[in-house]
Amino acid sequence: MMENGIWKDALIQSMKKLSPKLQVKNPVMLLVYVGAILATSLYFLGFFGISDEKAGYTLAIALILWFTVLFANFAEAIAEGRGRAQADSLKMARKDVLARKLKNLEDKSDVIEVASNDLKKGDIVYVLANEQIPMDGEVIEGAASVDESAITGESAPVIRESGGDRSAVTGGTTLVSDWLVIRVTAVSGESFLDKMIAMVEGASRKKTPNEIALQILLVTLSIIFLAVSATLLPFTEFASKQAGAGSAISITNVIALLVCLAPTTIGALLSSIGIAGMSRLNQANVLAMSGRAIEAAGDVDVLLLDKTGTITLGNRKASEFLPVDGVTEQELADAAQLSSIADETAEGRSIVVLAKERFDIRGRDFAEMHAEFVPFTATTRMSGIDYQGNTIRKGAADAVRAYVSANGGTYPKECDTIVSKVAGAGGTPLVVVRNNKVLGVIYLKDIVKNGVKERFLDLRKMGIKTIMITGDNPMTAAAIAAEAGVDDFLAEATPEAKLELIREYQREGHLVAMTGDGTNDAPALAQADVAVAMNTGTQAAKEAGNMVDLDSSPTKLIDIVRIGKQLLMTRGALTTFSVANDLAKYFAIIPVLFYGIFPQLEALNLMDLTSPTSAILSAIIYNAVIIIFLIPLSLKGVKYREMPAGKLLSRNMLIYGLGGLIAPFIAIKLIDMLLTVLGIV
């Protein structure tokens, strides 16, 4: 907790937070703050003989109340200090640099140098290797390696290029190679880096709806206890006269009783719990645009997960050559390798490697063959090679069928059987055709990640439904979904289908989370309750999401849900503990405080506390000290366990509810004994 001097800064901030302007933000602790001021005033009145209050006792109460306020300030300051430490490293990346602003896009020598802080949206800048990108933007020309370690912590450079889903760049990152022409999409103060700094510092953190609702409950309880405490002075004065025994309660004891009964424990820690939750998300390299998004993550019960990269490893691998009748496996492998020689994808390279391993088929002299490679396009959905009068194509089954038919050939039914078999096994079939004759099928296998099935099982135990999103055909999607253990799948997914699926679940009352990186994902991201945009994605995707994953890892969504649930669990557990504490303190203080007037209350003095003075001091010391003991838990969070909500609630009620009842009885009695031994009371 005490990393690199954060505690020193927290101590200083704790004192600064004694300002009334800051104390007003926390109504429960404001009550303690006012109580401390009143007790201090009563001490001076008693010291100079103006009041009947015992000066020494009143001073002790006043000091303990001031420490209670300071401990609450310290909890918040520690949480904020962690954020500031994180923000300081980010600020080092935010420097005002000179940018080359292009006057004419066609002439890159026609530039004017302007400060990055003076750039406006729509300005075009030209950035060269080893220069810092001056402001957030969209690459409109060029391709280059970019070092984003200042923001993501990842040392390996990433590729940024115009077009596609890798066109967004972030101000403060550095070009490692080549050059880029960038259209500025943010102004100074509104950049991605500025938002990150504001969020981790807590400067822009607003209270979430759940926080506000809980604070209203705590304030209501405090007002009730305030009203009860205010009536005790006239009530005990009247009761003591009627009983002819005892005496009226002192104002100091009324203040102490009010502070003990008010929900000060959770009131002191509520802010630090929220800040720490945001900090845990930042440590996972995820930037949340609001605390509401983190809370929503904790309530999510439907996860939409991309197949590639999340459920499967992402690189399909050639595992078999399946020829049709009349064609040998080696003949198919030879044609498949020729069609893949110029294919730079992982799938293409795996086909070349498999042919080499199975049949020792080596490279050829393509210059001598007068070979012409045909690249894959979204229109043809095929790639291949033309050489010495021969034509080889490989691609999706329906694309090859259309190609063969268009060229007057015959597509064998046997090939359909092989394609169905491969798809049914969860693989991707690529059909190979040479000179308009179908040779067979390449079996590309999708490899499901290790341990993913167990993770989905844990999510199911928690009541979270998992849905795999894939562009594969329904048969392939069903096979992979069964192997991975997801609850459902959406095959041949389009942006419109994803958007409609989210709306359908939301109409049924579910909270939906999803990830996305492309402009076509933006509508679905905007609709989802928790929308995690990839940092490598487009500007449109980032703006549509309410979180950004700096690591651009699709599996991070599961971790985000875990952090959200941990935040809600921590707040609920400490609220339960605080309320249970108040109940225990009630039994500790009330009987001892009033048995002089009502002797029957002696039977309720379960802890056999020495005296009313000792009881009050013991309870109020415990009330302050317990805040310090709970600060690590509020920052670290309650340990998250994958189990149904009902079991989780029962477990936490047992630990924090029953624990909250027992702990004060033991601690207050021990403090009472210590005060007695030391002769303080």
From Swiss-Prot:
Q: Which residues bind ATP?
A: D343, E347, F376, T377, A378, T379, T380, R381, M382, S383, K394
Its cellular-component GO annotations read: plasma membrane
Q: Which UniProt keywords apply?
A: ATP-binding, Cell membrane, Ion transport, Magnesium, Membrane, Metal-binding, Nucleotide-binding, Phosphoprotein, Potassium, Potassium transport, Translocase, Transmembrane, Transmembrane helix, Transport
Chief place where the protein resides? membrane
Q: Does the keyword Mitochondrion apply?
A: no
The places in or outside the cell where this protein is found are:
Cell membrane
| SUPFAM superfamilies the UniProt entry points to | Calcium ATPase, transduction domain A (SSF81653), Calcium ATPase, transmembrane domain M (SSF81665), HAD-like (SSF56784)
What is the active site of this protein? D306 (4-aspartylphosphate intermediate)
What reaction does this enzyme carry out catalytically? K(+)(out) + ATP + H2O = K(+)(in) + ADP + phosphate + H(+)
What domain of life?
Bacteria
Q: Where, by residue number, does the polypeptide cross the bilayer?
A: 30-50, 59-79, 216-236, 255-275, 587-607, 615-635, 661-681
Tell me if S-adenosyl-L-methionine is a UniProt keyword of this record: no
Care to name a GO molecular-function term for this sequence? Answer: ATP hydrolysis activity
Q: Where is the signal peptide?
A: none
Query: Topologically, how does it sit relative to the membrane?
Result: Multi-pass membrane protein
> What are the EC numbers?
7.2.2.6
- Per UniProt, the enzyme's principal EC class comes to translocase
Q: Where does Mg(2+) bind?
A: D517, D521
Q: Which HAMAP family does the annotation name?
A: KdpB
Give the quaternary structure.
Answer: The system is composed of three essential subunits: KdpA, KdpB and KdpC.
Family the entry assigns:
Belongs to the cation transport ATPase (P-type) (TC 3.A.3) family. Type IA subfamily.
This chain's function reads: Part of the high-affinity ATP-driven potassium transport (or Kdp) system, which catalyzes the hydrolysis of ATP coupled with the electrogenic transport of potassium into the cytoplasm. This subunit is responsible for energy coupling to the transport system and for the release of the potassium ions to the cytoplasm.
| Protein name (database record) | Potassium-transporting ATPase ATP-binding subunit 1
Natural source organism: Listeria innocua serovar 6a (strain ATCC BAA-680 / CLIP 11262)
Tell me the lineage of the source organism.
Bacteria, Bacillati, Bacillota, Bacilli, Bacillales
